[in-house]
């Protein structure tokens, strides 16, 4: 298994956690994660952690989530804080499958989770009491499986028309998703 890489931006007490898709960098395509990080620091006074998702991570998702949260705790020491988690592609799966083990995770934005891998692990969403927004691009392969997510009053599924897995030609829309779905500021 490859090593998770981290980027850390220090600002406020609470944390925006972003977990990339497989092979993603801490900056992201066209610096999308870096741009969201700057937005989080400037608009929401948050610190930011970006964690990459190495190849094969879905097979070690629980271990990876623990490593990511250990990294966050090493930066926060004994402070109380909330985590607002954004996962993209398999990074969304990692969060959705294991967030319940970490009470400091307050809200979740899962962008285009891969619904063809370990579908049974999504069952825990049926009893979740945290705000979970799952966003699919209409043209993403996993969108056709969106109805297989368990029904829950806390889980909202949103389908964006004419958007593919990579948000091709829609980078600004991707960058605005935390505003809309984590912080409810259209």
Per-segment meaning from a language model:
Residues 32, 57-78, 97:
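Alpha/beta-hydrolase active-site loop
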Residues 141-147:
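Conserved alpha/beta-hydrolase "acid-adjacent" motif
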Residues 2-54:
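Short, surface-exposed "cap/lid" segments of acyl-processing enzymes
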Residues 128-129, 134-136:
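Short beta-strand/loop motif that positions the catalytic acidic residue
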Residues 86-95:
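Gly/Ala-rich beta-loop-alpha elbow adjacent to hydrolase catalytic centers
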Residues 59, 163-175:
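Catalytic histidine-centered segment of alpha/beta-hydrolase-like enzymes
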Residues 109-118, 139:
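Active-site nucleophile loop of the alpha/beta-hydrolase fold
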